[in-house]
């Protein structure tokens, strides 16, 4: 019984720590999943329309690199 209570308290403490850490780090990851162009442009420096780009770098503010290697 005592061991069960200790385990429950430990799980609750770890859960609380996870929730606090997740709340503090919200919006600070640079390339999490590239969910939106707005988040990408706010977290990194992006290139404007017509600037040279690479499709693998995701560095255009618009989020799209054209066929000719220029931001769209």
Curated annotation (Swiss-Prot):
Molecular function, one GO term: calcium channel regulator activity
Q: From which residue to which does the signal peptide run?
A: 1-22
Q: Modified residue Cysteine amide is at which positions?
A: 71
Q: Which residues form the propeptide?
A: 23-45
Q: Which GO terms describe its cellular component?
A: extracellular region; host cell presynaptic membrane
Domain of life the protein comes from = Eukaryota
Instruction: Please list the disulfide bridges.
Output: 46-61, 53-65, 60-71
**Which keywords, in A-to-Z order, does the entry hold?**
Amidation, Calcium channel impairing toxin, Disulfide bond, Ion channel impairing toxin, Knottin, Neurotoxin, Presynaptic neurotoxin, Secreted, Signal, Toxin, Voltage-gated calcium channel impairing toxin
Q: In which tissues is it expressed?
A: Expressed by the venom duct.
Quote the PROSITE patterns the UniProt record gives: OMEGA_CONOTOXIN (PS60004)
Q: Where in the cell is it found?
A: Secreted
The record's comment on protein family reads: Belongs to the conotoxin O1 superfamily.
What is recorded about the domains?
A: The presence of a 'disulfide through disulfide knot' structurally defines this protein as a knottin. The cysteine framework is VI/VII (C-C-CC-C-C).
Q: What does this protein do?
A: Omega-conotoxins act at presynaptic membranes, they bind and block voltage-gated calcium channels (Cav). This toxin blocks N-, P- and Q-type calcium channels.
This protein's name = Omega-conotoxin-like S6.6
- UniProt source species: Conus striatus (Striated cone)
